[in-house]
Amino acid sequence: MKFQSKRGFTLIELLVVIAIIAILAGLLLPALAKAKSKATGISCLNNNKQLGLAWLMYCEDFDGFMPPNQNGGGSRGWVNGWITFNANATDNTNILWLVGSKKQVGPLYPKLGPYTSSPGIYKCPADNYTAKMGNKRVARVRSNSMNGFIEGAAYNGGKNRGSTWYSSHKPYNKLSDISGKDQAGAFGGGVTSPTELWVFVDEHPDSINDGWNIMNPNTDASWVDLPASYHNGGGTYSFADNHAELKMWKDPVPKTEPVRQSSRNGFSNRGKRKGMNDYWWVIERSTSRL
């Protein structure tokens, strides 16, 4: 009886198989990463919508008045605390500055706290940045900020005054204030209805600090506070009618602004497109001229 020996792989054949697997992996991994980023983008949109719903519930309970949105970490705002990359900053991990009650926190309690039960909605799921606390790294509790032109009577100004920071432009204290000229920035376009006024945004990890996000409506030379680009170069916004959008950035800032893990503000708008660019897109959804 004759036995036929079984032929094994040659080295060349094995290398070909390995090369094919490597090529397939190279094709599939970016697609998987993009799919994961898309999934976190959807989750982030949902978080912003939940915050927007809490914001509207507050407005309904207070006769249309919006929650106060005062700058500064020790302010009476919709949230409190100061998010930073500085070591041993307790605000980085204090969820009571997000969802704490007046009984728990005192008069500086976060005004949306009673309307939100889950601290997770205050953070983008793609925000994996940490800060040092003692001898370990810990996750920071918040990624979101509110439109700085939404003041919610935080500064006790008169009915007909301009924004506390940019007097030629409109602030918003009540829902009934959401109207105005179709003109905000250099190229037309401004807030005329709730569908056009953004309320919450995910802020760039280096830029975020208090719960307040402002931009200069008179020039696009630099971003005072910078939106994030966690989702394939895009960032999420929620609006006063409680719809949410994923804005895909086109300009280098904010699309590819690096995260240095160093708290900073004032981002040069280098590489911006001439004319209507990402900066003016945000301004036209932030306020309108008086």
What are these regions (language model features)?
Residues 39:
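Phosphate-proximal small/polar/acidic motifs at interfaces that engage nucleotide phosphates
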